[in-house]
Amino acid sequence: MSLKPVKLAFEKYSATVAKHPPVLIFHGLLGSKRNWRSLAKKFSCKLDRDIYAIDQRCHGDSPCVAPLSYSAMALDAFQFMKDHKLDKASIIGHSMGAKTAMVTALKWPDKVEKLVVVDNSPWYQDLPRDYGAYFRKMIQIDEANITKYSEADKMMSTVEKDILVRSFLLSNLKKDSNNSNTFKFRVPIELISKSLKTIEGFPASLNDLVYDSPTLVIRALKAPFIPDSALPVFKKFFPKYELVSLDCGHWVHFEKPKEFSESIINFLNN
């Protein structure tokens, strides 16, 4: 099956004077461009670069089109640069977006000035068991025709006690276009849940490729996504990588926003 790119929704944060190539930001699984608003504004000021916070396919306001694979999402990223006449950009990717960013850099290295990989590795990586429970519960919520956000929150609280994580997951709820009294998820829950094995993986076709430009890897020490055993794999694909480890969980940009943003600003300004 030949892949076709989709037009990605985005929010642009313009620098007062853009002195350097722009930055593309790719969110994680079930995230969206909205999760990055405050950091994107900060980056545009501190980096003198235009910042594009982007919704990946099947997320946010971008089209819901199969397949949800890294080859497809990287092609979307490449097409986005083409459509917006961006000769070169730096890319920041978190979680699923980190793999999209890595695949894009490996396939089109001349298009990527610098790469920032946030808490994911270039290999097969099991998602925590919580994700299966999240998706099963989200399907139940979608089918329940709920009329209040609080009802969805109550249902989700049976599988996730942390209110911040629940609020992140439920940020995908919106009023149903066919019935404004009920809420539905804006993302295709069934398609994404069927694509989890692909999302856990990394394309084997890239095994002989190298991205030989500066790469920053930000690791969350309280998450399982970048174990020490992954570091030689980073060295193979990204020989110029440097590692920053932060004492937090997987949602690094929420838990350690100051340290996270300073690491990226220093790296991109260097």
From Swiss-Prot:
Domain AB hydrolase-1, chain residue ranges per copy: 21-257
Subcellular location: Mitochondrion
InterPro entries: AB_hydrolase_1, AB_hydrolase_fold
Pfam families linked to this entry: Abhydrolase_1
Gene Ontology CC terms: mitochondrion
Active site: S95, E190, H250
Keywords, in A-Z order: Hydrolase, Mitochondrion
Main localisation: mitochondrion
Transmembrane domains' residue ranges: none
Enzyme Commission no: 3.1.-.-
SUPFAM superfamilies linked: alpha/beta-Hydrolases
GO molecular function, one term: carboxylic ester hydrolase activity
GO biological process, one term: fatty acid metabolic process
Origin superkingdom: Eukaryota
PANTHER family on file: PROTEIN ABHD11 (PTHR46118:SF4)
Family that this chain belongs to: Belongs to the AB hydrolase superfamily.
Protein name: Abhydrolase domain-containing protein C22H12.03
Organism: Schizosaccharomyces pombe (strain 972 / ATCC 24843) (Fission yeast)
